[in-house]
From Swiss-Prot:
Tree of life domain: Eukaryota
Protein name: TBC1 domain family member 9B
Region called Disordered, residue ranges: 397-443, 974-999, 1069-1093, 1128-1157
Organism: Homo sapiens (Human)
CDD domains: PH-GRAM1_TCB1D9_TCB1D9B, PH-GRAM2_TCB1D9_TCB1D9B
Pfam families found in the cross-reference section: GRAM, RabGAP-TBC
Domain GRAM: 142-209, 288-356
Amino acid sequence: MWLSPEEVLVANALWVTERANPFFVLQRRRGHGRGGGLTGLLVGTLDVVLDSSARVAPYRILHQTQDSQVYWTVACGSSRKEITKHWEWLENNLLQTLSIFDSEEDITTFVKGKIHGIIAEENKNLQPQGDEDPGKFKEAELKMRKQFGMPEGEKLVNYYSCSYWKGRVPRQGWLYLTVNHLCFYSFLLGKEVSLVVQWVDITRLEKNATLLFPESIRVDTRDQELFFSMFLNIGETFKLMEQLANLAMRQLLDSEGFLEDKALPRPIRPHRNISALKRDLDARAKNECYRATFRLPRDERLDGHTSCTLWTPFNKLHIPGQMFISNNYICFASKEEDACHLIIPLREVTIVEKADSSSVLPSPLSISTKSKMTFLFANLKDRDFLVQRISDFLQKTPSKQPGSIGSRKASVVDPSTESSPAPQEGSEQPASPASPLSSRQSFCAQEAPTASQGLLKLFQKNSPMEDLGAKGAKEKMKEESWHIHFFEYGRGVCMYRTAKTRALVLKGIPESLRGELWLLFSGAWNEMVTHPGYYAELVEKSTGKYSLATEEIERDLHRSMPEHPAFQNELGIAALRRVLTAYAFRNPTIGYCQAMNIVTSVLLLYGSEEEAFWLLVALCERMLPDYYNTRVVGALVDQGIFEELTRDFLPQLSEKMQDLGVISSISLSWFLTLFLSVMPFESAVVIVDCFFYEGIKVILQVALAVLDANMEQLLGCSDEGEAMTMLGRYLDNVVNKQSVSPPIPHLRALLSSSDDPPAEVDIFELLKVSYEKFSSLRAEDIEQMRFKQRLKVIQSLEDTAKRSVVRAIPVDIGFSIEELEDLYMVFKAKHLASQYWGCSRTMAGRRDPSLPYLEQYRIDASQFRELFASLTPWACGSHTPLLAGRMFRLLDENKDSLINFKEFVTGMSGMYHGDLTEKLKVLYKLHLPPALSPEEAESALEAAHYFTEDSSSEASPLASDLDLFLPWEAQEALPQEEQEGSGSEERGEEKGTSSPDYRHYLRMWAKEKEAQKETIKDLPKMNQEQFIELCKTLYNMFSEDPMEQDLYHAIATVASLLLRIGEVGKKFSARTGRKPRDCATEEDEPPAPELHQDAARELQPPAAGDPQAKAGGDTHLGKAPQESQVVVEGGSGEGQGSPSQLLSDDETKDDMSMSSYSVVSTGSLQCEDLADDTVLVGGEACSPTARIGGTVDTDWCISFEQILASILTESVLVNFFEKRVDIGLKIKDQKKVERQFSTASDHEQPGVSG
């Protein structure tokens, strides 16, 4: 490539001059190419350690003048061919012109101008593609692709200098972190180390420091442990590695690949060595941290942050911290964790103004809101720019949010308005955060009753607080405490959140304020206000729609807090149904998961349907990520954290719990339902209060406190059942003595009776103990532990999926368990490669975790073609892609252009582990429909229908049993998806109302079992065109075999014999008076000994050294006897339905002469002369003149039994098909191609001399 000219002071230090003229020098890097000796090794080592560009471009051209000592680089090249092209251009276009100049300065100026012009011309047509990466970074990306053979689609994120510990020796080199791979390369004095690890294969990633490895990063895969150290900035490197591994786990979890953020703004000053991808990932990390800290919606993007102070009127202090600005919010977080948090939605802002600066208050900024609150920030570094950014965002904010914000905010400031709320104008408007229960609607106004306020108010007797005695007084005091807090710290979204707020939450939220504060602390209020009418729209869309999720919802509705009166009534049940169905419709990835019904029923007790819906959104999508999906990954991750915390805080108990296996049993129910399913309702709801304020750390603290309180009893337990019973009784007796609601006994407590109940435990005391003993947990630490556990959990689930898939493969498939697992990993890698590099962008090709394990990974025809070429024992040279396409169509039973692992293994097994008959059956079917390509289907219809004798009633015998192990629902899914409109709805309705009983499944199972009872007599007959294709395939298969000549002789003999059998069968059927187009049946077949044996002898190819055979050519036209072999190369007079059109375009594109026929005598034809487009036709009564201008004989046909019997007469063919091939070596080679596992190469460079 041409380079912008740069000075080079020392031209010959590490370079060898190969060509020169008075103005230019072509040089090669020392050590590149052959030899190089010790100098070459040293130069190569320097290039790697110093990251020299000479690794990518070992050739260069310098401009020089005779009297000057300075050289200028004008071009470089990665190959001799590339650099020679540039050299020749310079010689042809510049040499004569340069000789005219007198001044050397003019020569140099002219050359530099010319090179700059060439570069500008080349770049003129290049479209700008987002952020341009720095030149040094582009060079590193080229090195990475060249060194590791990565495609253009693999993007480099960053690269770092480090050492890889190979044994006890550190190898200095470069670590390349790409979107999908971790790569390392080192070259030191002839020793080369190359590593490639897929992020999806990593099972452990941690930063540690030991005596052996000072500050190192450990990377574990299923096969090995890798250690990297001596980083310049190990913290940055590890953080980026964590992020990339997280992206890979997310891809395994839900197939969400990495997509660049096109909306990321360009930097004002381009960073020198930071790529656009690195900036993108850094921005993502900051956005995620920002959203998690302030509980903001998932689409909120951080614009920037700056240091400042905030004036807090409640304690008259200036609190230092950070201000964060995003599209819709201004947030503040104090440096001290509990000092103050603040969230100001821009929709609430009325005035932003710069106040007067003073020595006490430098650069102040005042922000006023609609709720009459004013916030004063100071010590802002760039106040003018900040005000401008806020103004820009305010201009984009709608001036009036739907839902009457102003009227609701009046009640936020003045709590007295809560007692007399004004009715809303429409059901789509969300309620006030200060009074979420205020919206009342007449139930008779709608066809279905809608819970427009918390169900607790509707189903609880409205007795005055005075009648409740001490409990009522305590509740009144709580309300007063919160109202005082609101007066001092503000009410609503803009509340100052301090340590005092947490203290009030721990004392319990009064029931009248619970729904409001849940909405505020969870961030659900922000989403509800910004999406007015969204829930009502979802309810309308989802009404009457049936799916698997709605069926599961209906099944669980009556299991949701059945002990509570609100859910013993149709009003509560209907509200719960609408909320769960609306969420399943909003998020089909989750749909519905068990335990969502229990949590949602509690949310409905304290809020309207819309509020409960948005609280559920906050819970499922932000606060408990990945909890409520088919594999409850999030809960399993937190279960792993719980086990780790138990080891840290309760080491005595940890080992005992592991032995009993209790943690895995208890933690899922505790975490998924937030203790609601294991504690009395009035106690568990206090934990939910703290959860919405603090997050998952409260659940973990309480779980540890429960184990700590029962340590002695647990240590004395002998089995899991005893431990579970003891813990269950303890939790049943956790009481809330301050609750004003009538006590609702826990369902399990009602069903179990005990003469010796344990002592009651106060829930507030349990919370107090949990904070005293385990409050050292921090949100950042939990996120770090979540990453570590997520790797383990997802890889464990992947291993479970692999075992499940392997178990679903029938035992008679022939492969061992290890071979099946290796094949599965290769198959999975091919699928993932399509996700990495966009080979398969169709939604059908993407992984769907909701499908059965067997159907989750599928590959398309192009991916299968690559796997087939590398794994098949039937190597056919250039014919292999055609054979692979036929095999794919044969295995693709449901015609969705994708095959799963079971179908793939079935095809492989037929080639590797079948006996002679089974292998020939596979080969035979590859030349019959459905192996014909879709393009061939129309032209092949007539012949296929005739030759298969009602092919529509016969399924592919090889693929007929492929779905035996799939559930009936999976088999039904495809036809339903293909239909559209009302038809699919009707089917869905039928499915929702009546499901098939067990007899239906038994009938289906019996039908599938019957399909396996296929004999060779059931195979359809093969016509002449198909037989010719079979012969071509066999000739190609034998081309690379050591017994090539013997196999050619044998197949020539068999082919001529079968051709004559077909001819005789056709004549015999004609004599018996059958229809002329009928094929010969098994009874019509004449005995083989009656055929002329001398004809078969004539058809055998001569020896390779026979000179007559080479000289014969096709000069013997018309001289062949009746038993001669006819070579047909095409025909132009065929009709539309002729069998010659059964070939696809790919199979006929190499035809040399489509309209000519030539008859070659048997003696003059060699096996080497048979091209791909050569077909063999022969017969006793078939004269060459009858064929000229005609078509391939459509009445000719032959059966599989005849082919099998003929091949059995040739021992060399029998030995070829019975030969055992080890698939292990082919799998190993394919793994290297796919880079399925970490591969480390340690090579010595040859020829160290001098």
